[in-house]
Amino acid sequence: GLHSNGYTLINDMLWRHKLSYKDSHIGKGTPELLTPTTIYSPLIDYLLNEIPILGMAHITGGGLVENLPRVMPKGLTAHVDYNSWKMPEIFSKIMLAGEIPEEEMKRVFNLGIGFCIIVPPDVNGIDNDIECWEIGEVRCD
């Protein structure tokens, strides 16, 4: 979900189009707007003892575009496959209602990915209660 991120852009968009949360299709039937941010620390505490973690990034303002590079050593780049997970519907609604370009959506919102861990390629699947995906790979520049 939104993870407490992007509400400024949503509010600006609603003001521009003279809409309210109540009257817009963004607010109607959209529990994602009120869903609390997931707390990842219990999962990370567990995983630190189970698998080698090479990097971690909480995906907040700046989306994957700005947050993943912050945890990458010089010379390495994250290559994200934005088709590797199903983006929650709230982001499509925001993009459509606000006429927000896809690249701006990638810079502002997490698009459904709230936290990333970087693991060696031989780590296959992580068994936990939080849905997760392999979303890309790390490459040398």
Model-flagged regions — what are they?
Residues 1-7:
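Loop-centered beta-sheet repeat module
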Residues 3, 12-141:
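Glycine-/charge-enriched secondary-structure boundary and capping motifs
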